[in-house]
Amino acid sequence: MIRIALIGSRELEQKPEYQQDIKLCYKVCYRLAELGVTMTSGLCALGMDGIAQKAYSQAILDGKAVLEQMEVYVKDEYEIKRSPLPNKHVARVRNPELIQATLELASSVHPAWHRCNEWARGMHSRNCHQVLGYDLQSPVDAVITWTPNGNIQGGTSTALRLAIKKGIPVFNLGVYDKTMVLAAIKELLLLKGVIHSAKALPPIYCLR
């Protein structure tokens, strides 16, 4: 089964004008869980990360997904302890044997690495696992994200830039034309054999 990174900006849940976007992102994540897609994410309480964690956890409670579909990465154990998200125990601390490799990867795509302190660099390096897996040799099949107006910004930008660099398709639900993005996601799922008909995706196309 395919793996998709579900990541994005905290701003999604910090401004009231994005309520419809929150609902859409949740529906997309829940449907992906139902379809057996494995998610990768970063345990951030706000934004697409948190929405995905909640949607997948609910799908598991509903008997429509399994815990093994959640692949979550964090910088350190403290992130797990302080997280309010369900099923936070599935999170893995970044691979200790590959910390230097993740730092090098993150620095290669970050526009202002010299301005990042140790904590920020750790968070950015964690993002590399979201895209390339625990061993950095297992890239996701795609990234579905939400950033304001589709801009590449914030902590998510490292993962997005890395995905683009590696030729991994990125679908951004923060853009105005969400129907186009949803259609592109559908095409990916058809191509990967996750679905065999557009009729398999009605919940995703309910924008309200």
Regions found by a protein language model. Give the residues of each.
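Acidic/glycine-enriched connector segments
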Residues: I2-K199
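Low-complexity, Gly/Ser/Thr/Pro-rich intrinsically disordered linker/tail segments
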Residues: K199-L207
